[in-house]
Amino acid sequence: MDFSTNGSEESELYHAQIHLYKHVYNFVSSMALKSAMELGIADAIHNHGKPMTLPELSSSLKLHPSKVNILYRFLRLLTHNGFFAKTTVKSNEGEEETAYVLTPSSKLLVSGKSTCLSSLVKGALHPSSLDMWGVSKKWFHEDKEQTLFECATGENYWDFLNKDSDSLSMFQDAMAADSRLFKLAIQENKHVFEGLESLVDVAGGTGGVAKLIHEAFPHIKCTVFDQPQVVGNLTGNENLNFVGGDMFKSVPSADAVLLKWVLHDWNDELSLKILKNSKEAISHKGKDGKVIIIDISIDENSDDRGLTELQLEYDVVMLTMFLGKERTKKEWEKLIYDAGFSRYKITPICGFKSLIEVYP
């Protein structure tokens, strides 16, 4: 190899090296975050009620004295990444000491809060989600339609969850945690639900989203529709009930059908079935309702590169776990029109997701 380069080429080479190394070692930041969550660092600082010094934090976490410097170095990385912030406090002797406080991001890891997303972090970084990448080369070369997860484990993710109660509970907790943040979207987009008398939350799990909608709009009769083994033992009330069934066969009738975090699990063929069944469900009593989709709408030309990167990463997650996909506006439009709908409206919500209203 010829290492004779001019200044411009040297600079380009160094920047390329930094870019490569950064992506190679991105996993360190993820695992440091997981360690912080498992140690309960955010909980410790929150419960302390004020900025926390390194010795105070180490003592609260009951760490061995030899690990104090290791904790410092983890905190240095996590602080650089925006999960904690540093401030200065006075010690009992009047000397200034560095102390740590929570940031908006680490507040999402505080246990017991309605906005806590610890279960999502735990699920995304669980060995079952990471180990599959070891067979990616085999997956690319084999002539078989299966997920990367199935290639690695011999079973699809849904079957894995149904056999592993701990993983199923973790998955349901993660979905419920994500749904709790949906409350903000409801408050900011009340007009979407105004005028509705009934709504079906398809694949609504244990009813977290339906309950939020019911709280905000008590007059709306909400039905949570999911697999019988998911909703079979759940109890509702006069305006909130649970129905078991198969969304690929039919969907209960209502003024509106909600598909939150559903269609990205499935390829276009299966998503088309769900949408057609949803269209039939809202066409009753001589009037047409609407389908409300909560999902990602990828904008590859967005000025927010971080947002687009997250959306594209989610797309690869859906691909490797479920053979699903995150869709661009053009892909959403084709899917919606192929299902027989006449118009739609996309509204960005919840940071990186979109609310898509679809009409017959």
Curated annotation (Swiss-Prot):
Binding-site positions, S-adenosyl-L-methionine: 202-205, 226-227, 246-247, 260
**Keyword Protein biosynthesis listed:** no
Pfam families, alphabetized:
Dimerisation, Methyltransf_2
Q: What induces it?
A: Up-regulated by copper.
Q: Does the keyword Transit peptide apply?
A: no
Outline what the protein does: Methyltransferase involved in the phytoalexin pisatin biosynthesis. Has both 3- and 4'-O-methyltransferase activities. Can use (+)-6a-hydroxymaackiain, 2,7,4'-trihydroxyisoflavanone and with much less activity (+)-medicarpin as substrates, but not (-)-6a-hydroxymaackiain, daidzein, formononetin or isoliquiritigenin. May be involved in formononetin biosynthesis.
Q: What is the lineage of its organism?
A: Eukaryota, Viridiplantae, Streptophyta, Embryophyta, Tracheophyta
Q: Which protein family is it in?
A: Belongs to the class I-like SAM-binding methyltransferase superfamily. Cation-independent O-methyltransferase family. COMT subfamily.
Q: Which PROSITE patterns match?
A: SAM_OMT_II
Q: Which reaction does it catalyse?
A: (+)-6a-hydroxymaackiain + S-adenosyl-L-methionine = (+)-pisatin + S-adenosyl-L-homocysteine + H(+); a 4'-hydroxyisoflavone + S-adenosyl-L-methionine = a 4'-methoxyisoflavone + S-adenosyl-L-homocysteine + H(+)
Sample GO molecular function, one term: 6a-hydroxymaackiain-3-O-methyltransferase activity
What does UniProt list as catalytic?
Answer: 264 (proton acceptor)
Write down the EC number.
Answer: 2.1.1.270, 2.1.1.46
- Write the protein's name: (+)-6a-hydroxymaackiain 3-O-methyltransferase 1
Which biological process annotations from GO are given for this protein?
methylation
Name the source's superkingdom.
Answer: Eukaryota
Database matches in PANTHER family? O-METHYLTRANSFERASE
InterPro entries xref list:
COMT-like (IPR016461), O_MeTrfase_dom (IPR001077), Plant_O-MeTrfase_dimerisation (IPR012967), SAM-dependent_MTases_sf (IPR029063), WH-like_DNA-bd_sf (IPR036388), WH_DNA-bd_sf (IPR036390)
Q: Which UniProt keywords apply?
A: Methyltransferase, S-adenosyl-L-methionine, Transferase
Source organism (scientific name) = Pisum sativum (Garden pea)
